[in-house]
């Protein structure tokens, strides 16, 4: 579990498509450097969020660490575009002594979005985004949380009528100085994790409705039957 408060920015040292070393596991691995500040208490097997993707440390030293990448992660995120020199946001998994300053972030990226606009507003930057996979747009609400490249941000506007749907965030100067997004340009991809709360609420509503519909004497079925009967009576009495 993470908070979306980026601890430091690291740099991709290597993206190995087939790492047959013991720590590579005969799969894709990525090595990230300039990460010494978050490795002082690191252990093999620890979780680190890299641009919002929860990844497992398989090897590390004083300044860099290696992680394994699954096919599912490649499909969901923009990890395939990380090449030598790419800067990435880094955050360790939360511990008992960490203040919870952002929001509940799993590190399970849902999809990617493209930056479609960026403009200054005072000392802030307003970024606009469009999702690759539109089924996640229903979880994006004004003043709700969203995790973009591992950064906890607040949605300031949702525009469902624009082509493909768009949403916007405002990034203050302090955040600009400590995350990678200001380095990106229009058209670049970012990783998106929507707020888990919306998914949980949707799931509970669906389960409740399914349960109600499956029972003939349920409150919902009784209500629907009464409405239908009333409509039929009104129609016949015309």
Swiss-Prot record:
Record-linked Pfam families: Lum_binding
CDD domains xref list: Riboflavin_synthase_like
Pathway listed: Cofactor biosynthesis; riboflavin biosynthesis; riboflavin from 2-hydroxy-3-oxobutyl phosphate and 5-amino-6-(D-ribitylamino)uracil: step 2/2
Top-rank EC class of the record's enzyme: transferase
Sites of Phosphoserine modification: 95
Protein keywords: Phosphoprotein, Repeat, Riboflavin biosynthesis, Transferase
Cross-referenced Gene3D superfamilies: 2.40.30.20
Keyword Repeat assigned: yes
Reactions that this protein is recorded to catalyse: 2 6,7-dimethyl-8-(1-D-ribityl)lumazine + H(+) = 5-amino-6-(D-ribitylamino)uracil + riboflavin
Binding site for 2,4-dihydroxypteridine 2: 54-56, 68-73, 107-109, 143
GO biological process: riboflavin biosynthetic process
Residue positions binding 2,4-dihydroxypteridine 1: 4-6, 152-154, 170-175
Domain of life: Eukaryota
Lumazine-binding repeats: 1-103, 104-205
EC number(s) on file: 2.5.1.9
UniProt GO molecular function: riboflavin synthase activity
More info: Present with 7300 molecules/cell in log phase SD medium.
Quaternary structure, from the entry: Homotrimer.
Annotated function: Catalyzes the dismutation of two molecules of 6,7-dimethyl-8-ribityllumazine, resulting in the formation of riboflavin and 5-amino-6-(D-ribitylamino)uracil.
Protein name: Riboflavin synthase
């Amino acid at each position: 579990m993470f908070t979306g408060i980026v601890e430091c920015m690291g740099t991709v040292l290597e993206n190995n498509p087939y790492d047959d070393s013991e720590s590579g596991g005969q799969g894709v691995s990525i090595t990230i450097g300039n990460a010494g500040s978050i490795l002082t208490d690191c252990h093999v097997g620890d979780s680190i969020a890299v641009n919002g993707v929860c990844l497992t440390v398989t090897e590390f030293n004083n300044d860099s660490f290696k992680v394994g990448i699954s096919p599912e992660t490649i499909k969901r995120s923009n990890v395939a575009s990380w090449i030598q020199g790419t800067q990435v946001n880094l955050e360790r998994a939360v511990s008992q002594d960490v203040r919870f300053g952002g929001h509940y972030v799993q590190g399970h990226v849902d999809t990617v979005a493209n930056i479609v606009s960026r403009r200054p507003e005072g000392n802030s930057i307003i970024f606009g985004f469009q999702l690759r996979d539109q089924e996640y747009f229903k979880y994006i609400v004004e003043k709700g949380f969203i995790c973009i490249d591992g950064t906890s941000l607040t949605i300031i506007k949702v525009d469902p009528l624009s082509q493909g749907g768009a949403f916007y965030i405002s990034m203050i100067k302090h955040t600009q100085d400590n995350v990678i997004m200001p380095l990106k340009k229009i058209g670049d991809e970012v990783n998106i994790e929507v707020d888990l709360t919306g998914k949980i609420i949707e799931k509970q509503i669906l389960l409740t409705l399914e349960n109600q519909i499956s029972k003939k004497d349920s409150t919902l079925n009784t209500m629907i039957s009464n409405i239908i009967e009333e409509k039929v009576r009104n129609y016949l009495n015309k």
